[in-house]
């Protein structure tokens, strides 16, 4: 579970923080469709990358809702990804130009995107080189499936 990621982060002197949107008592709960095992796999791949490419600062996991989706956003203070590489990071064997010294074949994001697309969800990336990245996992809510 999450503990192993906390330990990996701690080994690099990084903290993983959680933030959620505070719900008012009257707010209806949001129901989203996802497969727990595969969703954790997708989130895990993103966390692994965040830890691998962040040397100072930390990682924040935020729960939010956006239009008809429930989302989990993972923000890091890592090396960031240039705009021209955004599409490529989801490729099957991608490893960034800036990360030649790191080990491992980048199948993680390819798999994460594939997993998210199964229930009709998606992944969004926003990033600034040298400042960090945010990967958003968007899960369809109950309303979407009725459309």
Q: What is the role of each PLM region?
A:
Residues 108-112:
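Short alpha-helical Gxxx[C/S/T] motif in the catalytic ATP-binding
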Residues 120-121:
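Conserved glycine-rich
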Residues 27-34:
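Conserved micro-motifs of the catalytic ATP-binding
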Residues 7, 79-80:
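Glycine-rich G1-box
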Residues 81-93:
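Short conserved segment of the HATPase_c
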Residues 58-68:
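Short beta-strand/loop element within the Bergerat-fold HATPase_c
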Residues 50-51:
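Short helix-loop "hinge" at the ATP-lid/N-box region of the Bergerat-fold HATPase_c
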């Amino acid at each position: 579970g999450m503990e192993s990621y906390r330990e990996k982060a701690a080994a690099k002197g990084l903290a993983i923080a959680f933030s959620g949107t505070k719900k008012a008592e009257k707010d209806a709960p949001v129901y989203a469709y996802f497969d727990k095992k595969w969703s954790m796999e997708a989130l895990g791949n993103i966390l692994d990358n965040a830890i691998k490419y962040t040397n100072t600062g930390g990682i924040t996991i935020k729960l939010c809702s956006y239009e008809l989706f429930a989302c989990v956003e993972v923000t890091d203070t890592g090396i960031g990804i240039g705009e021209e590489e955004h599409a490529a990071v989801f490729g099957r064997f991608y490893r960034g130009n800036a990360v030649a010294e790191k080990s491992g074949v980048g199948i993680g994001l390819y798999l994460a995107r594939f997993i998210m697309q199964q229930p009709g969800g998606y992944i969004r990336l926003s990033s600034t080189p040298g400042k960090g990245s945010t990967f958003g996992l968007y899960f369809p809510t109950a309303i979407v499936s009725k459309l």
